[in-house]
């Protein structure tokens, strides 16, 4: 009767209000996007200038793509407070002032590796921390390792260089931490960037504790983090193994992969083919783990 109709109308009104609120929030995000992108661009430019790397103009195709990914995936960051609770933002990260132990950020890598630039950008923008990122060496080469296939996108090497990226190796990690630089390392490397079908969020980390021993030797603080969303953002149609086995494109990829280094078991620089499924990225930084009490031997 009347009560049922009133309840129905109230429910419709509440739904309309909720929809209007969501639309207003979305409009606010869209309106703020240019400001966030400009802040990110200026942060990148400042980092590059400090390293003597000129800021390219106009922005590279890779940077334009990153801007689109930022809007599409809306990364959200959390850190762990003294009580062990996750709180929004990065204010709870350990001190990073001069003289503080270097931080070694360790976490899972997500499909296609967009998480790396997102973390670098957020740490620089929110905390003023310029990380040194250890990346797959071919990503820092001027020519695409898969040429003439334009992957990675033009401008990737220059952007990574401006952001302080260095070719990943044990020696590079030692140099970075010994200089007191806060460092980002994805132990799973390219193997996690180009996961196969059915491997969402699986870790492919080496069994060796060498990284922990090195951190202890240099009195670095381990800062573990977990990333979510990236492996849900792509539906893989053909994974790396299927492309390598393809009679059509397999010879092309096999020839190029044979010339590239392998840093993690079974890593191959062959991007899967699939569909983008926009999903928010989440990054949760855990409590810091000092290594001053660990025997590096």
Across the structure, where does each feature detected by a protein language model lie?
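Membrane-anchoring hydrophobic helices of lipid-metabolizing enzymes
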Residues: 10-122, 127-171
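Non-catalytic C-terminal accessory region of glycerolipid acyltransferases
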Residues: 3-5, 10-41, 47-65, 175-297
């Amino acid at each position: 009767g009347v009560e049922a109709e009133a309840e129905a109308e109230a429910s419709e009104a509440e739904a309309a209000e909720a929809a209007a609120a969501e639309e207003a929030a979305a409009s606010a995000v869209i309106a703020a996007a240019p400001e966030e992108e400009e802040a990110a661009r200026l942060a990148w430019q400042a980092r590059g200038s400090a390293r003597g790397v000129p800021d390219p103009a106009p922005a590279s195709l890779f940077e334009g793509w990153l801007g689109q990914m930022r809007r599409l995936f809306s990364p959200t960051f959390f850190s762990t407070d003294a009580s062990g609770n996750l709180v929004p933002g990065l204010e709870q990260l350990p001190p990073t002032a001069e003289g503080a132990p270097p931080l070694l950020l360790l976490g899972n890598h997500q499909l296609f590796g967009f998480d790396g630039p997102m973390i670098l950008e957020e740490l620089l923008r929110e905390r003023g921390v310029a990380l040194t990122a250890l990346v797959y060496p071919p990503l820092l080469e001027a020519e695409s390792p898969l040429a003439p296939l334009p992957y990675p996108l033009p401008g990737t090497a220059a952007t990574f260089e401006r952001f302080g990226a260095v070719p990943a190796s044990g020696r590079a990690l030692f140099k970075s931490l010994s200089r007191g630089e806060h460092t980002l390392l994805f132990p799973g490397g390219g193997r996690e960037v180009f996961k196969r079908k059915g491997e969402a969020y699986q870790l492919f980390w080496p069994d060796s504790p060498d990284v922990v021993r090195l951190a202890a030797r240099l009195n670095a603080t381990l800062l573990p983090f977990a990333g979510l969303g990236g492996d849900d953002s792509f539906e893989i149609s053909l994974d790396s193994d299927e492309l390598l086995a393809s009679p059509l494109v397999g010879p092309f990829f096999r020839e190029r992969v044979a010339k590239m280094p392998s840093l993690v078991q079974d890593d191959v620089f062959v991007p899967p083919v699939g569909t983008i499924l926009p999903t928010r990225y989440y990054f949760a930084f855990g409590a810091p783990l000092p290594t001053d009490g660990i025997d590096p031997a």
